[in-house]
């Protein structure tokens, strides 16, 4: 693994490696030691006591953050007829049918989220090999396969983030930007924690949140006490 740069090392020195911080302390510290030359993203990482290999311990969904993410999401909606008109009225960036299947197959990715009505999933399904590895495939669990395209587009534009447990049992989620007020970041952090607590699989045994940390785009991780949320 490549050695981190001097700015990273300087930031790391400001973190007490033996301390577990409260959510408020961790967010304040992450903001303070961030050294990016742009408005970096603040991210939280949960290490959960689940076995993702088991179907009954999969965790996936989406949550609307009360203070948004600080990023404007570009939304592509696969819909036709009245649903296409609804998507356009809701502020979708792109709305269409098979023409977008062709564009994506040719390497076009000027969007962040795809929403599709159920009747369009036959078309979207053709893109499985392209969209799947990028995490862009619409899914009913995240509210992106739906007839209510207005609600879906509005929520994404308002600051909806998707979460999914990875093979190691980790869930990562962006909770805003370094420029956000610390209190707003903490409120978003608590919202993500609350939804993950509600999503705890019945089959999960032992400690649910094993480790928790806050970081910025290039910054080091800061350990957080789950009880502080």
From Swiss-Prot:
Q: Which GO terms describe its cellular component?
A: large ribosomal subunit
Instruction: List UniProt keywords, sorted A-Z.
Output: Repressor, Ribonucleoprotein, Ribosomal protein, RNA-binding, rRNA-binding, Translation regulation, tRNA-binding
GO MF annotation terms: rRNA binding; structural constituent of ribosome; tRNA binding
The alphabetized list of GO BP terms reads:
regulation of translation; translation
- Phosphoprotein is among the record's keywords: no
Q: Which InterPro entries match?
A: Ribosom_uL1_bac-type, Ribosomal_uL1, Ribosomal_uL1-like, Ribosomal_uL1/biogenesis, Ribosomal_uL1_3-a/b-sand, Ribosomal_uL1_CS
Q: Does the keyword Ribonucleoprotein apply?
A: yes
Q: Tell me, what does this protein do in biology?
A: Binds directly to 23S rRNA. The L1 stalk is quite mobile in the ribosome, and is involved in E site tRNA release.
NCBIfam families recorded: rplA_bact
User: How would you summarize the oligomeric state and partners of this protein?
Assistant: Part of the 50S ribosomal subunit.
Name this protein carries in UniProt: Large ribosomal subunit protein uL1
- The source organism is Listeria monocytogenes serovar 1/2a (strain ATCC BAA-679 / EGD-e)
UniProt gene name: rplA
């Amino acid at each position: 693994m490549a050695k981190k740069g001097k700015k990273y090392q300087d930031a790391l020195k400001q973190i007490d490696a033996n301390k577990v911080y409260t959510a408020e302390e961790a967010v304040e510290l992450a903001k303070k030691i961030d050294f990016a030359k742009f408005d970096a993203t603040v991210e939280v990482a949960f290490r959960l006591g689940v076995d993702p290999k088991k179907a009954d311990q999969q965790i996936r969904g989406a949550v609307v953050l009360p203070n948004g993410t600080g990023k404007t999401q570009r939304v592509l909606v696969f819909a036709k007829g009245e649903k296409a008109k609804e998507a356009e009225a809701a502020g979708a960036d792109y709305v269409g049918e098979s023409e977008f299947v062709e564009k994506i197959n040719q390497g076009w990715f000027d969007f962040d989220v795809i929403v599709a009505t159920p009747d369009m999933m036959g078309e979207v399904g053709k893109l499985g090999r392209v969209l799947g590895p990028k995490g862009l495939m619409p899914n009913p669990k995240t509210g992106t396969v739906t007839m209510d395209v207005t609600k879906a587009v509005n929520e994404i534009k308002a600051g909806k983030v998707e979460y999914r447990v990875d093979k190691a049992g980790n869930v990562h989620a962006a909770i805003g930007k370094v420029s956000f007020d610390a209190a707003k970041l903490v409120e978003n952090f608590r919202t993500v924690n609350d939804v993950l607590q509600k999503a705890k699989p019945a089959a999960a045994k032992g400690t649910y949140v094993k480790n928790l940390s806050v970081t910025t785009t290039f910054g080091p991780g800061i350990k957080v006490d789950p009880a502080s949320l």
